[in-house]
Amino acid sequence: MKPIRMYLFGTRWIDFYGVAIWFAQSRKWPAHVGCYFAMEDGSHVGFQAQHKVPGMKYGGFVSFDFAEYQKRYHGWKAKLTGKKMWVRYIDLTDDQLLAKYLKCKRLERDVLGYAHTQVFGKLIHERLGFPMQRDPRYVDCSESMAMVMAEDTPEYDVRDSENTNFDSVSPSELWANLHAALAE
């Protein structure tokens, strides 16, 4: 499986194989969006948009220990944003899911509206045909790649679901659960 290669805001190149995005909604903050990327070696690179989270750069990327991040900030984040919090997995290497992704009604809200406008701007523009302001230096992806999201990808309540309880499930187990759910 080939990775997606991305240039991180003028800092360095990374290759990553999947991404999980968490969304949290509350009356005070209608949209609180962030994501983290799974690397081949098991490490993670995180991105935070909309609001600052302690330990992460605003609107940029940092490398971090995923388990430690969740241990330190998950409780605070859940309390801040209320009950509507979930993780959605996106497979960035499977073109077969592109058709489902194109039918996703939440495309504009979940992808174009927040963190991904700059991060995947070039990819969205070239593959999906959405016009947008973008800096081509941010992303370098081959034409064979596609950012995809299954229309029926389940939503995960990260506080109530046993499969996505970050306090007790390791990152590797989490990714296995998300892959399994996407394949069903």
Label each PLM-derived region with a short phrase.
Residues 3-91, 127-133:
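Glycine-rich catalytic cores of cysteine/serine-nucleophile enzymes that process amide/ester linkages
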Residues 77-82, 91-125:
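A structural motif
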Residues 27, 32, 41, 106-112, ...:
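Structural alpha-beta junctions
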Residues 116-184:
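Activation targets extended, charge/polar-rich intrinsically disordered C-terminal tails
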Residues 27-30, 97, 138, 142:
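Solvent-exposed, acidic/flexible segments
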